[in-house]
Design a protein with these regions (language model features):
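Short, small-residue-biased leader/transition segments that mark boundaries at the very start
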Residues: 1-3
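Basic, alpha-helical terminal appendages of large translation-related enzymes
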Residues: 9, 15-30, 34, 39-280
Length: 280
């Protein structure tokens, strides 16, 4: 068995199709009911693709999960013409389809974290994120124009530099005059919550592990669990065990019911925003 052979972390491992595992993964009873209704009842043997269950969970979590900002692979962004020591608030909706849930304040400062994939020194065609000379909107914040980057001795980019346009802040008069294609999420470096995040994926690479004469252990997905340190908006520090959120642009995450502590939650990915296993 996977559990006894230490391929997983016990019967409540979020990758396992057990009730305790599904609960720890952040799956909801409503999502399971939608799954049962979708597949129906049949007396004949049938094989249901795992993506059907994931789709049901996405639909349910999309409706119920408040939105938050998380940077999973952080790269420093420095706004050179933003006053040092200055801070202000930007305002983000808790749920875009539920205005009754209100908005929350997100702190903004001179140094931010952005996703590493959101910068390219030599971008491919059709790349609308940050690169030297290009402008993007920092979601809920300002429009910025990239002016360059810093690298270490190995050539790895360690920081990106930009300038901002003070009259471009989202929600203020005249902000819509700035027409840009890129819209990036970010977290203030001074306020970010450095958090353990567990990126779970399917336990097996094959839809029918061990089929035929194969050893099912050989079908295990070596990338089914990745642990990273992410930079999260500070509001997420107050999350309670089993609180669920959509991390914008990433997917749906749950505060782990076993390892989270007051003021220091640990998050696990329940499901991505779209099916990463889809063919074509």
């Amino acid at each position: 068995m996977c559990s006894s052979d230490l391929h997983v972390d016990g019967w409540d491992d979020p990758r396992l199709p057990t009730l305790v595992g599904a609960r720890r993964r952040g799956y909801t009873p409503e999502g399971f009911r939608a799954f049962a209704e979708r597949i129906g009842v049949s007396k004949a043997d049938s094989w249901i693709d795992y993506s059907v269950l994931e789709d049901c969970m996405r639909d349910d979590l999309n409706a119920r999960a408040e939105r938050r900002i998380a940077v999973l692979d952080p790269l420093k962004l420095v706004i050179d013409n933003y006053p040092e020591g200055q801070e202000e608030e930007c305002f983000a909706p808790n749920h875009p389809q539920k205005p009754e849930l209100g908005k929350r304040a997100v702190p903004f400062s001179r140094e931010l974290w952005i996703e590493r994939e959101d910068f390219a020194e030599n971008p491919p065609k059709g790349y609308f994120r940050l690169f030297p000379g290009n402008s993007v909107r920092l979601r809920y914040g300002f429009v910025v124009k990239c002016t360059g980057c810093e690298k270490d001795a190995s050539g790895k980019v360690t920081a990106v530099h930009c300038e901002y346009f003070p009259d471009s802040k989202s929600g203020t008069p005249g902000a819509d005059a700035y027409k840009v294609k890129g819209n990036l999420h970010w977290v203030s470096a001074a306020h970010a919550y450095a958090c353990e995040v567990r990126l779970y994926d399917r336990l097996f690479r094959e839809p029918n592990p061990g089929a035929g004469d194969r050893d099912y252990i050989a079908d295990l997905n070596p990338q089914s669990k990745e642990i990273i340190t992410a930079c999260l908006e500070p509001a997420l520090k107050q999350a309670k065990p089993e609180d669920r959120f959509q991390f914008e642009r990433h997917g749906y995450f749950v505060a782990d019911r076993m390892d989270s502590k007051p003021g220091a939650p640990v998050f696990s990915r329940a499901v991505t925003l779209k099916d990463s296993w889809a063919k074509g």
